[in-house]
């Protein structure tokens, strides 16, 4: 059963609002994103939603079933974002960006670069060298993926966003080819010497995203 979504309102500058929630059911948030986007007007403020998900595999519109190698009893949801299969679970920051891309004069590639840049900026604060990849969207540290990206564009507006691994059980990634890449390693901030709590990193990521979107 899809549960109603409750997000704590935290105002942001320049028509951008940031909202926080705890650990949420994926289907509930997905339906809420679609409803928000469908009801937007040209004056609707853009929003960033920061939360975590209960364990779930999400399969993008281009997702191939063979990238799910086995199913350890975790739900699989075929969603409407771009990309292949990935895993979400507690201990991972989910940042959903609900933006009017026409109003921001942003193309998809530009937005992807800004999202990657925000994560790179955050990790740079902790002297962790990270980078994006032109051919495989996301953020990587030493060849291991630490953040996955996926978007849905509808009527010039976007939803979905990024997932940053912080301090989670990485074992479910072993049951998939993450983002469709065989043998792709994954990592997380807690394995890179970053000891700040998830809530601290959430706030910092929000600031990095807002800064990148203003550039």
Curated annotation (Swiss-Prot):
InterPro entries: aa-tRNA-synth_II/BPL/LPL (IPR045864), BPL_LPL_catalytic (IPR004143), Octanoyltransferase (IPR000544), Octanoyltransferase_CS (IPR020605). Residues 42-215 form the BPL/LPL catalytic domain. The active site is at residue 179. Keywords: Acyltransferase, Cytoplasm, Transferase. It catalyses: octanoyl-[ACP] + L-lysyl-[protein] = N(6)-octanoyl-L-lysyl-[protein] + holo-[ACP] + H(+). Substrate binds at residues 81-88, 148-150, 161-163. It is an enzyme of class 2 (transferase). Belongs to the LipB family. This is Octanoyltransferase. It comes from Nitrosospira multiformis (strain ATCC 25196 / NCIMB 11849 / C 71).
């Amino acid at each position: 059963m899809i549960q109603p979504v409750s997000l704590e309102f935290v105002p942001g500058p320049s028509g951008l609002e940031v909202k926080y929630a705890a650990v949420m059911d994926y289907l509930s948030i997905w339906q809420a994103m679609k409803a928000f986007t469908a009801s937007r007007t040209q004056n609707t403020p853009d929003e960033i939603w920061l939360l975590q998900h209960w364990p779930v595999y999400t399969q993008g519109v281009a997702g191939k079933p063979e990238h799910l190698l086995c199913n350890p009893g975790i739900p699989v949801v075929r969603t409407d974002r771009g990309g292949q299969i990935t895993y979400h679970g507690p201990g991972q920051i989910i940042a959903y960006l609900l933006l009017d891309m026409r109003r921001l004069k942003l193309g998809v590639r530009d937005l992807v670069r800004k999202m990657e840049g925000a994560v790179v900026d955050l990790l740079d604060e902790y002297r962790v060298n990270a980078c994006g990849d032109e051919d495989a969207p996301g953020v990587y540290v030493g060849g291991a993926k630490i953040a996955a990206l996926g978007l849905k564009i509808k009527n010039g507006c976007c939803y979905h966003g990024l997932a940053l691994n912080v301090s989670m059980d990485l074992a479910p990634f072993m049951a998939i080819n993450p983002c469709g890449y065989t043998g792709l390693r994954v990592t997380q901030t807690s394995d890179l010497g970053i000891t700040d709590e998830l809530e601290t990193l959430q706030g910092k990521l929000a600031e990095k995203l807002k800064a990148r979107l203003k550039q």
